[in-house]
Regions:
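Thiamine diphosphate
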Residues: 1-145, 149-156, 160-315, ...
Length: 315
């Protein structure tokens, strides 16, 4: 059975903790009755309640004591409510804390704006030293969790709610800097996918158009700088698909890193959901759906696209 990103994280961390006694798990009122880590390692599981900032601060102390803490809470509460703690803990102290943030984007759907998070990449990408990942599918999530557990570096891992996705093929156990899921004519447009829904839409658009598709997992400045160089060696026109605000997202970062290339964005824009609905309905209301991606590819092919201004806000 294919697991969601959140469930794959919990399962992989539980497995790793059986061999590494320094791994500990903290949740902010999200553990539930059947958390696999709590069942397998009850003395290393802490449910701290609705106290996200305090949870991150606790994790910093555990890291200073030689442990490898993984903390998890909804993305809006991790990246926004606890932003100060993330800045001081992951940034200033460079503590080896991994934050796993489900409910990213608008995967919270009918829970509404309080449970949506379209700004987390902008916040975390501005904190130096934090490794940022947005895995797609179970295999990538497991690989990212394993890497974070080994590294001892601060991480922010972005995932959705309960949706499952078929993993992209991986050659080996390590994630490539750029996963070229499909490579076409270098003179044509290249889709660049970010996160779960950005990748789902890009896969569908690639199947419909035959353009190249490059998938990114690691989104911090260090990784994106290297990825941008690889992208530019193969293509010069990119449509970036991401479930994030235009400001501070990956498209804007790539536009700055690739000034000689054409970069346009298909994202969540600058609006707020005004009606309820499921995940995909809320995305569509914000302008993020397959027709929007296909339109962006078509416009770029015909020279009618609106590029992301390097040094300015994405449109």
């Amino acid at each position: 059975m294919t697991l969601s990103g959140r469930d794959a994280y919990r399962d992989e961390l539980t497995t790793l903790a059986a061999e590494d006694a320094s791994l500990v798990c903290l949740e902010a009122d999200l553990g539930g009755k059947n958390h696999p880590f709590q069942t397998a390692h009850p003395d290393r599981f802490f449910n701290v309640g609705i106290a996200e900032g305090a949870m991150v601060d606790m994790a910093a102390g555990l890291a200073a004591g030689g442990y490898k803490p993984f903390v998890s809470t909804f993305a809006p509460f991790a990246a926004l409510r606890a932003a100060e703690s993330l800045k001081l803990t992951l940034g200033y102290l460079n503590a080896g804390v991994t934050v796993v943030a489900p409910y990213a984007g608008v995967s919270g759907a009918w829970f509404g704006t309080t449970h949506h998070c379209l700004e987390d990449l902008a916040v975390l990408r501005s904190v130096p030293g934090v490794t940022i990942a947005a895995p797609f599918g179970e295999a990538e999530m497991r690989a990212v969790v394993r890497s974070a557990a080994r590294s001892g570096r601060p991480h922010y891992i972005r995932t959705g709610r309960n949706a499952t996705y078929e993993s992209l093929p991986l050659a080996g156990t390590e994630l490539p800097l750029v996963n070229w899921e499909f490579l076409a004519d270098s003179d044509d447009v290249c889709l660049v996918s970010v996160g779960e829904e950005g990748t789902r839409l890009s896969l569908a658009a690639r199947a419909a158009t035959g353009v190249s598709h490059a998938h990114l997992v690691y989104l911090d400045h260090e990784h994106l700088t290297e990825a941008a160089a690889e992208l530019a060696r193969r293509h010069s026109r990119f449509v970036v698909v991401e479930e994030h605000r235009s400001q501070g997202g990956v498209a804007e970062a790539l536009a700055l890193l690739l000034p000689r290339c054409e970069v346009t964005a298909v994202g969540a824009g600058q609006g707020w959901p005004s009606t309820g609905g499921d995940h995909h309905e809320v995305m569509a209301a914000l302008g993020l759906d397959l027709p929007a991606v296909l339109s962006a590819v078509s416009r770029m092919r015909t020279g009618a696209s609106e590029p992301v201004p390097a040094g300015g806000f994405a449109r």
